[in-house]
């Protein structure tokens, strides 16, 4: 359908639209008109992605110079967004005909997901793929007449830069195009990003400085940036600027230094001019000159605004001097890790200690990362991953030399499970997520932060330190209540249930938790997903259930599958869980909050008719890094410790229960099995689209009350439900859309405005005449 939102004609590729989709697009349009950042929460499974793409692609028709940069978390989400973009653009083009603008939508991923070179693509490890690719595509390898080359890359270098693509290219499309034209999909994608109207890739290509400066630094400032599924965006920013160092890494770094030193000595004997040329480039401030796109590995780990645009200091221009400096840094870090005490200090205090011991200044440290990259290129090293140890040390040196505020260094014992010993770990921690977001907010005209679970919205604006132009928290419009939340506070024996540390192992609590699953598995059809607070607690409670005979009772109703920390095992368990649901046998999947199942996998329709959340998934508060971050948030942004911990736990809980609702025709039971969920300060941090169903009869339930409520709910959901019943309330046709005040064509809006002005003028004239008569 086509409809107006104010002065914008929107092309929406479906015949019907949800009211919340329309409201979402109105808020998004208002944000784009105003510019600046916005934060939008929309119910899970109500078509957020297609709403975004429809509105923004229509906005691009009116503003053709604007680029859309769409960021998501995982490869499946990138592929899903690309297919939605294909659907939106096909509809727009069919409606506009010859007037439709030529549009390129380009997705992007790693070499591992795009490589088509037979020998390289059969490797599963991404680091190995990267190394083999660089071996075949580096400029020095290609100069050698005897070395093996990649024909796909050679064809791209010869013809790829002249190609003008049009249409939508998913990762699979790129690989097919590459095979058909014998051209490298990875480098083609990287090249075409600069010309694409719509770019779809992962967060790291924009938020991780080491990658962003190579991939997205040339994007125009009038672009629209969308962070979809952005409920964990603060953690992405923090992880991109944090580094952990242990003794094993330092030993690897020492070996790396020795190996590099030997290669320098070898080159001096056969090709000393190469080192002299590099020295001259560094003197002239041209560290990257002479390198090609294929030679570049990663860039500086610091944000673009903080990169020093000047020549490398004289004391590290010579390769041997630089290696000597790295050796001193590594030795100093080794000495710091010898202490068995827990230590925390600011970067400034660390730099003072380093300078006192080694005479290395912070200014010199800032150049370590770029200097090492230059040296590895000069030495013509393809497999840079074998030097990952010293590369991480160089990244740390650059970061600690650049940043002070919002960072902390923590040295603490770390338990090594495989050796059953404690080893010291040196952690350079970013505490302030706003540092990573600031360059994005500063550069781009519009930044959209959106997800189904962003509540409470105000805490994101504090943590990321921005003032949104638009804030919207949408509810779900429904003709029937397809969500049944149950706040379970006690078992059928009226004993309170909770995973609080002091009661979580209580026999009565564990028994009640098991009895709940037995009863739920007897009445709920198809699939049930259970989330525990940790792997250790899941193992503990399942073991006790087995001793009590509860697992056998569950198995009479459904099969049981378990998520583990091993990705391959979990993938197999998930595959068999879905098979059991498809066959009608039904299944229970035992998984962990903050695990893979809780974040990236949807359980629509028969795969998720009920989700049980055992306890509140609080993060481990014993972590010294977390304690430091909590203190920072309290002092800097006035976010209280308990406020953040509850917020973090409830967004994780929302993600878990949101897995089972993937559309309005879907339905599911959400059981929050912990008495603490009944407290208002916890419950109010759930998304609005869940809260709207938390009526008094859903609160403070015992197991038998929850089972009774669930039976009634499932009977209601089993009744026939047609599209006609939804029309007008939870589903709109074009007729319903056009009745909205914001959906009048511009001519009608202008007529209404002119009519108002005319009426106002007439009234003013009449009033003026009366006043003059009165004065006379």
Curated annotation (Swiss-Prot):
Residues 7-277 form the Helicase ATP-binding domain. Residues 742-754 have a biased composition (Polar residues). Keywords: 4Fe-4S, ATP-binding, DNA damage, DNA repair, DNA-binding, Helicase, Hydrolase, Iron, Iron-sulfur, Isomerase, Magnesium, Metal-binding, Nucleotide-binding, Nucleus, Transcription, Transcription regulation. Its cofactor is Mg(2+); [4Fe-4S] cluster. GO terms for molecular function: 4 iron, 4 sulfur cluster binding; 5'-3' DNA helicase activity; ATP binding; ATP hydrolysis activity; damaged DNA binding; DNA helicase activity; metal ion binding. ATP binds at residues 42-49. Residues 736-776 are annotated as: Disordered. It is found in: Nucleus. One of its GO terms (biological process) is transcription by RNA polymerase II. Belongs to the helicase family. RAD3/XPD subfamily. This is General transcription and DNA repair factor IIH helicase subunit XPD. The gene is repD.
């Amino acid at each position: 359908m086509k409809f107006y939102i104010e002065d914008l004609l929107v092309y929406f590729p479906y015949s019907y639209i949800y009211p919340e989709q329309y409201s979402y697009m109105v808020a998004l349009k208002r944000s784009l008109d105003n510019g600046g950042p916005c934060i939008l929460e929309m119910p899970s499974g109500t078509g957020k992605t297609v709403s975004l793409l429809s509105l923004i692609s229509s906005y691009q028709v009116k503003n053709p110079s604007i680029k859309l940069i769409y960021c998501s978390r995982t490869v499946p989400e990138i592929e899903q967004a690309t297919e939605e973009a294909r659907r939106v653009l096909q509809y727009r083009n069919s409606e506009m005909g010859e007037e439709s603008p030529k549009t390129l939508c380009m997705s992007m991923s790693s070499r591992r997901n795009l490589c088509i070179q037979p020998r390289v693509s059969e490797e599963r490890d991404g680091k190995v793929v990267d190394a083999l690719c660089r071996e075949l595509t580096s400029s020095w390898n290609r100069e050698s007449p005897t070395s093996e080359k990649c024909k796909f890359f050679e064809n791209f270098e010869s013809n790829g830069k002249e190609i003008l693509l049009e249409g939508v290219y998913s990762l699979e499309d790129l690989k097919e195009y590459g095979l058909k034209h014998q051209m490298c999909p990875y480098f083609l994608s990287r090249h075409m990003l600069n010309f694409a109207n719509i770019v779809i890739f992962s967060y790291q290509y924009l938020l991780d400085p080491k990658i962003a400066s190579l991939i997205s630094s040339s994007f125009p400032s009038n672009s629209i940036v969308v962070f979809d599924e952005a409920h964990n965006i603060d953690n992405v920013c923090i992880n991109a600027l944090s580094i952990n160092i242990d003794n094993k890494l330092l030993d690897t770094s020492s070996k790396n230094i020795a190996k590099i030193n030997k290669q320098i000595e070898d080159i001096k004997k056969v090709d000393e001019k190469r080192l002299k040329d590099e020295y001259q480039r560094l003197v002239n401030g041209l560290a990257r000159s002479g390198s090609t796109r294929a030679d570049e590995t990663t860039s500086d780990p610091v944000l673009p605004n903080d990169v020093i645009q000047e020549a490398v200091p004289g004391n590290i221009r010579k390769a041997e001097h630089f290696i000597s400096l790295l050796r001193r840094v590594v030795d100093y870090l080794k000495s710091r890790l010898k202490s068995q005490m827990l230590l925390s200090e600011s970067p400034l205090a660390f730099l003072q200690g380093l300078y006192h011991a080694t005479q290395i200044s912070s200014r010199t440290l800032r150049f370590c990362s770029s200097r090492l990259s230059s040296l590895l290129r000069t030495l013509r090293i393809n497999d840079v991953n074998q030097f990952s140890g010293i590369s991480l040390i160089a990244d740390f040196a650059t970061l600690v030399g650049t940043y002070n505020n919002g960072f902390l260094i923590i040295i603490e014992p770390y338990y090594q499970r495989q050796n059953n010993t404690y080893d010291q770990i040196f952690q350079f921690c970013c505490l302030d997520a706003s540092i990573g977001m600031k360059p994005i907010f500063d550069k781009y005209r519009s930044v959209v932060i959106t997800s189904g679970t962003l509540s409470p919205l105000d805490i994101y604006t504090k943590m990321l330190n921005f003032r949104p132009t638009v804030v919207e928290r949408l509810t779900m419009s429904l003709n029937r209540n397809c969500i049944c939340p149950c706040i379970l506070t006690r078992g059928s024996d009226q004993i309170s249930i909770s995973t609080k540390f002091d009661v979580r192992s209580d026999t009565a609590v564990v028994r009640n938790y098991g009895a709940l699953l037995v009863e739920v598995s007897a009445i709920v059809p198809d699939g049930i997903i259970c989330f525990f607070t940790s792997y250790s607690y899941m193992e503990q409670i399942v073991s006790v259930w087995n001793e009590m005979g509860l697992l056998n009772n569950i198995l009479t109703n459904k099969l049981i599958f378990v998520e583990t920390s091993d990705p391959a095992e979990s993938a197999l368990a998930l595959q068999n869980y879905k098979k059991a649901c498809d066959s009608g046998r039904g299944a229970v999947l035992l998984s962990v909050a903050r695990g893979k199942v809780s974040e990236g996998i949807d359980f629509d329709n028969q795969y998720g008719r009920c989700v049980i959340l055992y306890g509140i998934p609080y993060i481990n508060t014993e972590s010294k890094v977390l304690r430091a971050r909590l203190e920072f948030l309290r002092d800097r942004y006035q976010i209280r410790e308990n406020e953040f911990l509850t917020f973090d736990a409830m967004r994780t809980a929302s993600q878990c229960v949101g897995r089972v609702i993937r559309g309005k025709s879907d339905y599911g039971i959400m059981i929050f099995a912990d008495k603490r969920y009944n407290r208002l300060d916890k419950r109010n941090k759930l998304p609005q689209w869940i809260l709207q169903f938390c009526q008094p009869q859903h609160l403070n339930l015992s197991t038998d009350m929850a089972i009774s409520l669930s039976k009634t709910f499932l009977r209601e959901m089993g009744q026939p439900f047609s599209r006609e019943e939804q029309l007008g309330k939870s589903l709109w046709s074009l007729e319903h859309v056009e009745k909205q005040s914001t959906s009048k064509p511009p001519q009608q809006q202008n007529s209404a405005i002119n009519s108002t002005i005319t009426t106002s003028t007439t009234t003013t004239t009449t009033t003026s005449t009366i006043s003059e008569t009165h004065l006379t």
